[in-house]
C-alpha cells in the first residue's frame, strides 16, 4: 500500500467516533449503572437532601420562633422596666410627701413645745416675781418699822397697824410705778 492510500484509509476511520460495538456495550453499561444509581443511590440522596431541607426549614422556623420569643421577652422586660421606673418615681414622690409632712409635724410640735416652755417660763417668772415682791414687802416693812422705831426712840410693836401702814405705802409706790410705765 502506498502511503497515500494509507492516509486515505486512516482518514476513513474517525478517531472521535467510537466503533459501534463499543458504543452499544458502553450504552448498556451506562443504562445498568444509571438504573442501579436511580434505584439504590438516588432515593438515599433524595432522602438526605429532603432531610437537610427539612432541617434547614425547621432551623429557620426555630430561629424565627426563638426570635419572636426573644422579642416578646424583650417587650416584657421593657414593660417591667417601665413599670419599675414608674413605681420608683411613685415611691420617691411618696417619700418626699411623707418627709414634708413629717417636717411640718415636727415644726408644729416644736412650735407647740416652745410656746409651752415660754408660757411655763412666764408663769414661773410671774410666780417668782410675786414671791420676791412679797418677801421684799416684808423686809421693807420690817426695816421701815425698825428705822421708825429708832427715829422715834420707841418700839412700834403693833403689828396689825404696822402691816396696814406698810401695805398702804407700798401700794401707793406700785401705783406710781405703774403710772410712770404707762406714760412712757
From Swiss-Prot:
Q: Where are the transmembrane segments?
A: 16-36
Membrane topology qualifier = Single-pass membrane protein
- The record's principal subcellular location, in a coarse class, is membrane
Please name the InterPro entries in this protein's record: ATP_synth_B-like_membr_sf (IPR028987), ATP_synth_b/b'su_bac/chlpt (IPR002146), ATP_synth_F0_bsu_bac (IPR005864), ATP_synthase_B_chain (IPR050059)
One Gene Ontology cellular component: proton-transporting ATP synthase complex
List GO molecular-function terms, semicolon-separated.
proton-transporting ATP synthase activity, rotational mechanism
Pfam families cross-referenced by the UniProt entry: ATP-synt_B
Location(s) in or outside the cell:
Cell membrane
**Which keywords does UniProt give here?**
ATP synthesis, Cell membrane, CF(0), Hydrogen ion transport, Ion transport, Membrane, Transmembrane, Transmembrane helix, Transport
The UniProt subunit note reads as follows: F-type ATPases have 2 components, F(1) - the catalytic core - and F(0) - the membrane proton channel. F(1) has five subunits: alpha(3), beta(3), gamma(1), delta(1), epsilon(1). F(0) has three main subunits: a(1), b(2) and c(10-14). The alpha and beta chains form an alternating ring which encloses part of the gamma chain. F(1) is attached to F(0) by a central stalk formed by the gamma and epsilon chains, while a peripheral stalk is formed by the delta and b chains.
Give the family from UniProt: Belongs to the ATPase B chain family.
Q: Which NCBIfam families match?
A: ATP_synt_b, PRK05759.1-3
Role of this protein: F(1)F(0) ATP synthase produces ATP from ADP in the presence of a proton or sodium gradient. F-type ATPases consist of two structural domains, F(1) containing the extramembraneous catalytic core and F(0) containing the membrane proton channel, linked together by a central stalk and a peripheral stalk. During catalysis, ATP synthesis in the catalytic domain of F(1) is coupled via a rotary mechanism of the central stalk subunits to proton translocation. Component of the F(0) channel, it forms part of the peripheral stalk, linking F(1) to F(0).
Name of the protein in question = ATP synthase subunit b
The gene that this protein is the product of is: atpF
